[in-house]
């Protein structure tokens, strides 16, 4: 028989939004999104025009797509910050920092219940954890205890009694806890001599990021053998108490397409004191996306917060300058950011501000940035030891700085790759990483020299790195590592 028609609702025709900016359109847009969610999914269309929004646009049900008429045609004009709309958001690590400097969005994709518990905690000034296991990281239960396995395995073995709970299509969380000797962190850093000698114990922010939590969908279950959608990111060793667990109800199959989010233009705030004029945030989201989306005059552009298997395609950050044009944190894994742009700022940077760039931190792993144009910013490995990430086919004016305090640990874990990177201002910092990142590859990078922010390696001894085609990115084949790897996988 015929497939049922997907539910479609229009914010102007069906919900009374005005496309001339004369009235607050947020209630109409959120009503339309809720209507789609209540029907099990659907598409919310926003015709060409400018829509004033005085509230957050929230996508909290799976399989809902918010679709404008194109980033050059549909504009959402945001008038208020997250501080005004939700409240002050302090840091769970203390001090007077504003967590809106790295969290939340004026378009916010997050499961309805998770968003409610998160914002309730913020209003109560409890400064929550932000990921897949709730505000205190205790919202989970064990489904299975897998047998030892190796990084890269797609099939794992679980006890027979556990296997009955692991049906095909179920989304589960792989949980790996560190041990007193911090051998899990050593493994993330490549298990080299430098990782074994590193002083992990006093890196209290880094150690707070463990356990490592990796969401994955089950694609096959036959007896005790469970097949996963993606290869294991790390070994499964008994000393790390590996478990497959439940997780908060995820947001899946949601997208934002064909629009510009423009915040009211206010001067950029001093570093770490952002009010939260933020762009699009994906939180506890799996297999969600943005396509043809521009954000303008924002504090922070596109955020991945405990998000996995999401794709940002044809996205752009422009306007008066931002703190994090793109950020990827709180254990975000397996995401793709491609055909992206960070456009040069339209006003000079105020004193006391910082520009990062394409950020990754907080034990986030296996993320890819591909086909980018960065007229400002840097490759912001923000400590917190991200690992296994690829940056490829990017042109960058390397004028940003990385962040991250010392208690967050190393800049890089193992297996970073920078491939075909064209550095127009010749600055080495965070571009050429053969002297910094263990088990890394720097392939086809422009000739660069050290100036500005200069880093020293976190790990002693041989880093086991590769430097190839230095000074001649135009000769590198394939020109785009991600596309080549994807082609091999699909064959």
What positions do the PLM features span?
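Extracellular "leader-to-stem" segments immediately downstream of a signal peptide or signal-anchor
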Residues: 1-269, 441-491
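Residue-level marker of regulatory loop/turn positions in helix-turn-helix DNA-binding domains and
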Residues: 21, 207-210, 248, 274, ...
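Short, glycine/acidic-rich beta->alpha junctions
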Residues: 24-28, 49, 58, 210, ...
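Short, T/G/N/S-enriched strand-turn elements that build extracellular solenoid repeat scaffolds
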Residues: 30-37, 52-61, 66, 76, ...
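Short His-Asn-centered micro-motif
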Residues: 46-48, 54, 59, 159, ...
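Right-handed parallel beta-helix
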Residues: 63, 72, 252-263, 286-297, ...
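Extracellular beta-strand/beta-solenoid scaffold signature
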Residues: 82-124, 237-246, 270-281, 297-300, ...
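Catalytic domains of carbohydrate-active enzymes that cleave complex glycans
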Residues: 371-372, 376, 389-491
């Amino acid at each position: 028989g015929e497939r049922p028609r997907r539910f479609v609702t229009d914010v102007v025709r069906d919900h009374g939004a005005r496309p001339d900016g004369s009235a607050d359109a947020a209630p109409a847009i959120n009503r339309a999104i809720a209507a789609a969610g209540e029907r099990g999914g659907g598409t919310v269309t926003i015709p060409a025009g400018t829509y004033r929004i005085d509230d957050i646009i929230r996508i909290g049900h799976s399989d809902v797509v918010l679709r404008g008429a194109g980033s050059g045609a549909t504009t959402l004009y945001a008038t208020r910050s997250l501080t005004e709309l939700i409240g002050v958001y302090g840091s769970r690590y203390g001090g007077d920092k504003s967590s809106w400097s790295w969290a939340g969005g004026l378009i916010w994709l997050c499961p309805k219940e998770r968003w409610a518990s998160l914002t309730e905690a913020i209003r109560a000034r409890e400064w929550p954890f932000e990921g897949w296991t709730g505000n205190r990281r205790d919202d989970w239960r064990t489904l299975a205890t897998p047998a030892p396995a190796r990084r890269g395995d797609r099939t794992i073995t679980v006890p027979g009694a556990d296997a009955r709970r692991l049906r095909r299509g179920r989304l589960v969380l792989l949980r790996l806890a560190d041990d007193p000797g911090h051998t899990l962190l050593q493994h993330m850093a490549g298990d080299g001599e430098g990782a074994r000698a590193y002083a992990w114990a006093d890196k209290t922010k880094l150690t707070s990021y463990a356990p490592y939590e990796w969401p994955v969908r089950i694609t096959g279950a036959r007896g005790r053998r469970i097949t996963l959608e993606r290869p294991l990111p790390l070994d499964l060793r008994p000393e790390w108490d590996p478990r497959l667990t439940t997780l908060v109800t995820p947001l899946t199959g949601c997208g934002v397409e064909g629009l510009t989010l423009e915040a009211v233009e206010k001067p950029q705030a001093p570093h770490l004191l952002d009010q939260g004029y933020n762009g699009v945030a994906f939180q506890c989201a799996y297999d969600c996306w943005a396509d043809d989306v521009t954000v303008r005059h924002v504090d922070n552009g596109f955020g991945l917060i405990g998000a996995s298997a999401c794709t940002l395609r044809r996205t752009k950050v422009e306007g008066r300058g931002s703190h994090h044009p793109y950020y990827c944190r709180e254990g975000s894994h397996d995401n793709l950011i491609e055909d992206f742009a960070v456009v040069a700022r339209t006003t000079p940077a105020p004193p006391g501000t910082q520009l990062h760039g394409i950020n990754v931190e907080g034990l986030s792993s296996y993320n890819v940035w591909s086909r980018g144009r960065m007229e400002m910013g840097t490759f912001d490995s923000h400590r917190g030891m991200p690992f296994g990430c690829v940056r490829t086919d990017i042109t960058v004016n390397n004028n940003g700085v990385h962040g991250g305090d010392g208690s967050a640990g190393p800049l890089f874990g193992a297996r970073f790759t920078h491939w075909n990177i064209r550095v127009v201002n010749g600055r080495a910092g965070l571009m050429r990483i053969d002297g910094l990142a263990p088990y890394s590859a720097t392939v086809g990078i422009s000739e660069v020299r050290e100036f500005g922010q200069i880093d020293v390696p976190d790990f002693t001894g041989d880093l086991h790195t590769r430097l190839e085609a230095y000074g001649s990115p135009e000769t590198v084949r394939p020109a785009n590592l991600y596309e080549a790897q994807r082609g091999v996988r699909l064959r």
